[in-house]
Amino acid sequence: MRTFLSILFLSAFFMNSFSQKKDMISLWPGTVPGESKPKAGPVADTKTKDKVFRYAEVTDPALEVFIPEKSVSNGSAVIICPGGGYNILAYDLEGTEVAAWLNSLGYTAFVLQYRVPGKKEGALQDAQRAIRVVRNNAGKMGIDPDKIGIMGFSAGASLSARASTRFNERTYQAVDKADSLSCRPSFTMLIYPAYLDQGPENSLTPELTLSDKVPPVFIFETAVDPYCNSAFVMGKALRDAKLSVEVHILPQGAHGYGLRKGTRAGETWPLLAEQWLIETLNTGK
C-alpha cells in the first residue's frame, strides 16, 4: 500500500510543487563571507531550451521553505542541494520538485540556493550555515533538531558529502547565536553524486575525512553514469570505516534525471529513499 501511494504522489506532486506553503530565509543577514559583490536576487539562466529551470548566479544565499500539511508532518526536515557542476543550480529538477515529494511524505523541505558560479568553498559555508539556521528555528517550525538531514544531486551531492564529513571544520566566523549550534546533518542522501573520486587513482577525495560521527548515508547511482565512480568509492569508504551506508546501483539511467517520470532510475530512487528514511528516522506511520 505504501509503495502504491508513493507512485500516486510521484504522479501528482509536479502539479502542486509551487502551490505548497513556502517562504524564503536569507542565510547571511550582513555581508556574505569572503564576498565583495553586493547581494542581489538569484539570476535565472534564460539560455537553456530544455525543461529545467536553472539559476546561473546566486549572490545572496537562501533557503526556500516548503512546509507539509500538518496532517502528515513527521517533525523531520531535509535540506536539498540542487546540482549543476557548482556553476548553476538545476533548481526545479533537483530542488523544488524534490521538496514537493518530501512534503508529500511529511518532511519539511528546504531548497538551498548556494553560491554559484565557481564558489565551491562558499557553497560549503552556505550549507553549514543552512543546517545551523534550520536547527536554530526547529522548535518554532515543529522540527526535531536531531532529525535535520541533507541531500543533493550531482554537484549538490558533492556539497552534501562535504557537509556530512567536514562539520567540525569552522569555515566562517560566527554571525549570530545559530552559529553556536552543530552543523552536522542527522542523515545524508547522495543521488548520482559527482566529484567524490578526486584522490589518487580515482579514490575518495581527500577533502572528505571520515569519522565515527558521519551520519547514516543513502547513495543512489546508475552504472552507466560517467560519474558513477563517485558512488562506488564513497560507498566503499563508508563500508570500510564500518559506518552506516546503503548503496543502490541500477544498470541504466545516465545522469541528471531528478525524480521525473520516464526513466527507471528517476522512478526508483524515491521509493528506495522513502523506505530508508522510515527505517533511519523511525517516521513510519
Positions of predicted regions on the chain:
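Short beta-strand element of the alpha/beta-hydrolase
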Residues: 74-83
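Primarily recognizes the serine-hydrolase "nucleophile elbow" in alpha/beta-hydrolase
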Residues: 125, 129-212
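Short beta-strand/loop motif that positions the catalytic acidic residue
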Residues: 218-221
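N-terminal cap/lid segment of alpha/beta-hydrolase-fold proteins
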Residues: 20-72
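Short amphipathic alpha-helix adjacent to the substrate-entry channel of hydrolases
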Residues: 91-110
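C-terminal catalytic histidine-bearing segment of alpha/beta-hydrolase fold enzymes
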Residues: 235, 239-285
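Catalytic nucleophile-loop/oxyanion-hole region of alpha/beta-hydrolase
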Residues: 89-92, 111-145, 262-266
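Bacterial Sec-dependent N-terminal signal peptides
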Residues: 1-23
